[in-house]
């Protein structure tokens, strides 16, 4: 991560399975994406309330992380970019398997960013894609194609 960041690459870290990270790592992370349990391991805060989420993001940003996304399952996600917080509400779906929801969220987030999409569109894409993935059984086969994701309703 340090080498990639120093070469000007945009670095994204999903610390799964979560474990404590060396302090020097944080300043080389442009975006960290964590779920609730990973958030607790990295910050000591299991995010139940909105204040918990804000405090956890404060801790990660104070350590040098550029942006933070905390996924909350059916509750959606909260993302902090350049000091501004964005809350995404997950669409209501008939979830049958959450195996690949987080990976789908991260993949869609990075895909949207790499395509040059605006932040709102990127977050909507990640939110909708991850929700859609939960309506299918399995891991890789549950990840939707871009044409399957409708961000107009997010």
What are these regions (language model features)?
Residues 1-55, 76-77:
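Conserved beta-alpha-beta core of the PfkB/ribokinase-like small-molecule kinase fold
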Residues 3, 19-25, 50-154:
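Conserved phosphate-binding/catalytic region of the ribokinase-like
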